């Protein structure tokens, strides 16, 4: 069974946490992780691109010249695609790029990235993150006490940590999520994971 050190908010060590190998100790599947990251990045795209076809471009209501007798090719509108200032043919329309992968694939990707962080020593467990009020400075002290210098993803329990979330929201390089909301993209993008002990239990309940 994999084990990680358990720390207190002040940075002192409180013991060790034994992790479930079926969640935090599997052989990472890089191909599945790649597929899920691409899927989640696609879901983030706005997809608000749009073009104007000949019916949407302003003007062009009058026939530029008569149908016959001029020697020139017949034209019905100056907003036809072949005209300068005319409409666009087969241009982009607003759309959603989101698509879903099977649940088992997403879960395997989550277990793979969690296992990678544990193997690399980049998962830090903390017994609790309790704050009497939302204070950014207090959360910054926790980050400093745990010697976290680069981008960190803080994983909180699913409920009851509103002050911790509000305290971390304004810190640079700190992103906060919950046990059920942590995404593969968030975990891969973070240099380290700071996970509350009760959140570890909730993660294992879902993925084991």
UniProtKB/Swiss-Prot annotation:
Superkingdom of this protein's organism: Bacteria
Keyword RNA-binding among record annotations: yes
Any one annotated GO CC term: ribonucleoprotein complex
InterPro entries per UniProt: Ribosomal_uL4, Ribosomal_uL4-like, Ribosomal_uL4_dom_sf
Coiled-coil residue spans: none
Renumbered residue ranges of the record's region Disordered: 45-89
Subunit structure comment from the entry: Part of the 50S ribosomal subunit.
Role played: One of the primary rRNA binding proteins, this protein initially binds near the 5'-end of the 23S rRNA. It is important during the early stages of 50S assembly. It makes multiple contacts with different domains of the 23S rRNA in the assembled 50S subunit and ribosome.
HAMAP family in the record: Ribosomal_uL4_B (MF_01328_B)
Name of the protein in its database record: Large ribosomal subunit protein uL4
Higher taxonomy: Bacteria, Bacillati, Bacillota, Bacilli, Lactobacillales
């Amino acid at each position: 069974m994999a084990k990680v050190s358990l720390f207190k908010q002040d940075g002192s060590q409180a013991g060790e946490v034994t992790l479930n190998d079926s969640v935090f100790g599997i052989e990472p599947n890089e191909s599945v992780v790649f597929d899920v990251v691409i899927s989640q990045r696609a879901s983030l795209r706005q997809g608000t691109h749009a073009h104007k076809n000949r019916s949407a471009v302003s003007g062009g209501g009058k026939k530029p010249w008569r149908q016959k007798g001029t020697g020139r090719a017949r034209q019905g509108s100056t907003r036809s695609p072949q005209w300068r200032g005319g409409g666009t043919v087969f241009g982009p329309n607003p759309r959603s790029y989101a698509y879903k992968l099977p649940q088992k694939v997403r879960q395997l990707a989550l277990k793979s990235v969690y296992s990678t962080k544990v193997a690399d020593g980049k998962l830090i467990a903390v017994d609790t993150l309790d704050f009497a009020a939302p204070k950014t400075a207090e959360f910054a002290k926790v980050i400093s006490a745990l010697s976290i210098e680069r981008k960190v993803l803080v994983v909180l329990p699913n409920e009851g940590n509103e002050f911790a979330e509000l305290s971390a929201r304004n810190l640079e390089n700190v992103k906060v999520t919950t046990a059920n909301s942590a995404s593969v993209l968030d975990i891969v993008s973070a240099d380290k994971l700071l996970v509350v002990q009760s959140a570890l239990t909730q993660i294992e309940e879902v993925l084991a």
